[in-house]
């Protein structure tokens, strides 16, 4: 009986130990490295703002000149999102995404917002305003028909992704910015500056899929769970420079001069709470901004010259967009009108104190 009892106890102990080991391994396997990556992410890099040519935009491989004519072959491929867009192939294998349509606010907003982020050091995808000649595009796209099964799209923009590799496929939520910590990570001043810039631009559609975690290293890493240099960036900025709306509607939210010019940067006269209404899918609304974040963004914005601001709105071709889209007799705002509105809103940030 004693030996039998001993064997039973031994078996039970071994079983318990094995279960504990399996449980530990299971917990290790379930551990998501995502939090660790976000905790040490950056959102801003030092840059020479005065040297930025906002009309030309980012140069280098894959860049296009302002309003360059680009010929491509239509690629029948489903793209995410609701705005007019299509995939197209330049040459043999250079696949690009084309956003198009004079009534599509994202055609203008993408250029304005990405150029501004790029100039200030927050990084973004590269968006180029071009004239696209598409071979084989469907008639329902309503391009201007040309001979040889070609159609022209103007205004249009071509997207080039930010250098690096996307980490994961979930994007990031604005609430996750508050998880960042550590010496290599973005300080609160940088994070609050990015939040305030999103308020300034009225970034309406802020769901996680509109932001990406990018590993800036050009070489692919062997272990997809690691990333030595994570950077949090905003990847879809079409619904900006209007007024953030519950439904992320194109006309009020995407480059609407009247709505943007009339929207105060701050909510109320005392606390530093950004005036950004929450959209149905958004993860950023009415953020509280620190004095360090306000000052950091103010110092960056003040480095932009009037020439650069004019170039920004010329690149965005704002003269093609009604002051109040949907209101046909609202007329068209000039680049000078937009520059004045930009500077007035910038002054609201510069003159505020959040201490």
What are these regions (language model features)?
Residues 118-122, 199-202, 347, 354:
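Sec-exported extracytoplasmic/periplasmic mature domains
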Residues 1-9:
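Bacterial N-terminal signal peptides that target proteins for export
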Residues 105-110, 172-258:
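Conserved kinase catalytic-core segment
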Residues 11-12, 16-76, 92, 315-355:
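Regulatory N- and C-terminal appendages and interdomain linkers associated
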Residues 134-137, 213-220, 318:
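Short regulatory "switch" loops immediately downstream of catalytic or recognition motifs
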Residues 20, 73, 89, 138, ...:
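Sequence contexts marking disulfide-bonded cysteines in secreted/extracellular proteins
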Residues 61-172:
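Conserved ATP-binding subdomain of kinase catalytic cores across diverse folds
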Residues 219-355:
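C-terminal catalytic region of ATP-dependent kinase domains
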